[in-house]
């Protein structure tokens, strides 16, 4: 986790060095739960790094209407996208996505965890405190 926080700090300090790091890459975003910060963060990050983000609105899609299975949707989507981020009601659905995807799936939030928020919080602590050493941190769900 510390390596991820260090990389995030480096990207934040030197954005020009990463301007093309996602060139020609496509991020597919599946958000069952509405989001402002998570969605904008991923879309902005992809744009600033030269990639593209596609938002899939489950409320108006065959998946959301129950006409297409999650497994089939992800199998198809992972043929087009390089990366998937999912913000879902059930963590078990995230597990299904990961099992049926041929590309990495990022947990953008589930009923079990919000790891991207944890990483953002750890980056903030590092920026304010200088490192992650010291008191033990814990979170309640």
Question: Which positions does each model-derived feature cover?
Answer:
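Positively charged, low-complexity intrinsically disordered leader regions
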Residues: 1-40, 44
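A generic local structural motif
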Residues: 14-17, 70-72, 124-125
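Anion-binding alpha/beta catalytic cores of soluble intermediary-metabolism enzymes, centered on
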Residues: 74, 82-141
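Electropositive phosphate-/nucleotide-binding environments in soluble metabolic enzymes
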Residues: 1-8, 36, 40, 67, ...
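Residue-level preference for alpha-helix termini and adjacent loops
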Residues: 10, 21, 35, 39, ...
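Active-site cofactor/substrate anionic-group-binding motifs, chiefly glycine-
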Residues: 26-80
């Amino acid at each position: 986790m510390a390596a991820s926080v260090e990389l995030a700090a480096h990207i934040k300090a030197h954005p020009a060095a990463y301007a093309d790091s996602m060139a020609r890459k496509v991020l597919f975003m599946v958000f069952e739960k509405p989001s402002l910060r998570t969605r904008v963060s991923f879309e902005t990050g992809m744009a600033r790094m030269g990639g593209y983000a596609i938002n899939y609105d489950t409320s108006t899609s065959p998946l959301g209407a129950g006409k297409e299975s999650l497994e089939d949707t992800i199998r198809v989507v992972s043929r087009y996208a390089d990366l998937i981020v999912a913000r879902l009601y059930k963590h078990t659905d995230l597990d299904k996505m990961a099992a049926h995807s041929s590309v990495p799936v990022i947990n953008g939030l589930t009923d079990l965890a919000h790891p991207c928020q944890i990483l953002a919080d750890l980056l903030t602590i590092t920026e304010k405190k200088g490192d992650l050493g010291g008191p033990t941190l814990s979170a309640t769900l």
